Amino acid sequence: SYTPELIEGLSEHRDVLPVKEVVLVDINEERLKIMEGFVKRFCQHLDYHVDVWSTDSRKEAFVGADFIACQIRVGGNKQRIFDEKIPLKYGVIGQETTGVGGMFNALRTIPVMIEIAKDVEKYCPDAWIVNYSNPTGLVTEAVLKVCNVKMAGLCAGGMRPRWWAEEALNVKEESIYYDYIGLNHMNLSLIHISEPTRPISI
């Protein structure tokens, strides 16, 4: 789950993105209650004052929402293992966002995301859907072709090369120019280190 990372990001940017309420939705009630308890404790730890509750009803969660953050994995981790291992068995990329595994993942995920988007159309038509569900690009494009919603596909992975460069080269964040083109596992990163003693481009 990306929920802890998402909550931490909202907390870090609370001055520019003042969130009042976070509603967690899951089809697995046991997992949902565990995550709700964790998020409440995490918010206390971060001194982040936001109402947190959970439900298994999309209607209940969506009414009045401004943003819907989706991070679903249809078939769970068990299916992800198949997506990654079966292609490898035949000598092709085994991965959840590209190749054969990515396509299988997309074929399972897109119909469910369309159902979710149709509920957004019905219960909160002005809300933005922020999609973290892989393969992000395919899923987002498919939903936008079928549904009348506002939607963006995102991946936190885009910032990782910058962080790795900072650590590997032992440079400060402000000395790095970072340009990122693409999404998820289909991208090009340009990193330029502008410290006077050693200008480097990667």
Positions of predicted regions on the chain:
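Metallocofactor- and cofactor-centric catalytic cores in central/energy metabolism, strongly enriched
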Residues: S1-Q79, N105-V171, N187
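Single conserved hydrophobic/aromatic residue that forms the stacking wall/gate
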Residues: I191-I202
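Aromatic-residue-lined binding/catalytic grooves and analogous aromatic/hydrophobic interfacial grooves
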Residues: G158, Y180-L183, L190
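Glycine/threonine-rich flexible loop motifs
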Residues: N77-R108
